[in-house]
């Protein structure tokens, strides 16, 4: 067996499906601004930058369906579809732009 390396992660062989069996909402998003906008994987999408035009009511309680720690960048004039999945766990949204600051299901 090879020596352990601090911080090293050893993964089992094979594939892992992220967010399996989660309900997916697809929204069309347009960047109406003059600057790029980047949204991270766990940002409450409803509260994303105001230059992004999309159905904010449909995005309530949802985040991007992308790997943790990654983001999607919307260039000025971009118009694309994104997949969103619901927050899970306690379903509390605190911070971001301060629009919710509490439970989503209250």
From Swiss-Prot:
Top-level class of the enzyme under EC nomenclature: hydrolase
Biological process, per Gene Ontology: urea catabolic process
Catalytic activity: urea + 2 H2O + H(+) = hydrogencarbonate + 2 NH4(+)
Entries under InterPro entries matching the protein: Urease_beta-like, Urease_betasu_sf, Urease_subunit
Assigned keywords, A-Z: Cytoplasm, Hydrolase
Disulfide bonds: none
A family per Pfam: Urease_beta
Molecular function per GO: urease activity
Pathway(s) per entry: Nitrogen metabolism; urea degradation; CO(2) and NH(3) from urea (urease route): step 1/1
Main location (coarse class): cytoplasm
Localisation: Cytoplasm
SUPFAM superfamilies linked to this entry: Urease, beta-subunit
EC number: 3.5.1.5
GO cellular component, one term: urease complex
Oligomer status and interactors: Heterotrimer of UreA (gamma), UreB (beta) and UreC (alpha) subunits. Three heterotrimers associate to form the active enzyme.
PANTHER family the UniProt entry points to: UREASE
NCBIfam families to which the protein is assigned, alphabetical: PRK13203.1 (NF009682), urease_beta (TIGR00192)
Family: Belongs to the urease beta subunit family.
UniProt-recorded name of the protein: Urease subunit beta
